[in-house]
A protein has these predicted regions:
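A short, N-terminal "cap"/entry segment at the start of jelly-roll beta-barrel domains
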Residues: 1-43
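Short, conserved beta-strand element in jelly-roll/cupin
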Residues: 51, 60-75
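Structural motif
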Residues: 55, 64-65, 72, 98, ...
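Ligand-binding loop in jelly-roll beta-barrel domains
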Residues: 87, 95-119
């Protein structure tokens, strides 16, 4: 069987996806996502995500490539590093990152995530 190209810019079947209420710091952000592709290992997936304005805590166990296509966001680490992004910007959030996401205006992004399996020790 031959693998097929997967378009990320077509019609979207959005699913509600958080954030968890105990992580929200400001506003009432509503997230929706559409996973367009997942690999057979379940470690890599990509698609589109959207959020209404708000601020919430994050703790990444995965590596995520983000490409903002609409809106403005600010991401701040617990160490105080602050980066702002708008439509057309691309960035990576590495596994182990802890901090906050703030969405200033309705945001849409493409994402590609790699989340390695946990290795069990013998």
């Amino acid at each position: 069987m031959t693998a097929s190209i997967v378009r990320l810019d077509g019609p979207v079947a959005w699913e509600e996806c958080g954030p968890a209420p105990d992580r929200i710091l400001q506003g009432q952000p509503a997230h929706r996502a559409w996973n367009a592709f997942s690999d057979a290992s379940g470690q890599f997936f990509c698609g589109r995500w959207t959020s209404s304005p708000g601020k919430w805590r994050v703790r990444y166990t995965e590596n995520e490539l983000c490409v903002i296509t609409a809106g403005r966001v600010t991401i701040e680490s617990v160490a105080g590093q602050r980066e702002s992004f708008a439509a057309g910007d691309a960035f990576v959030v590495p596994a182990g990152f802890e901090g906050t996401w703030t969405v200033h205006e309705e945001c849409v992004k493409f994402y590609a995530i790699f989340e390695p399996r946990q290795v069990r020790s013998a």
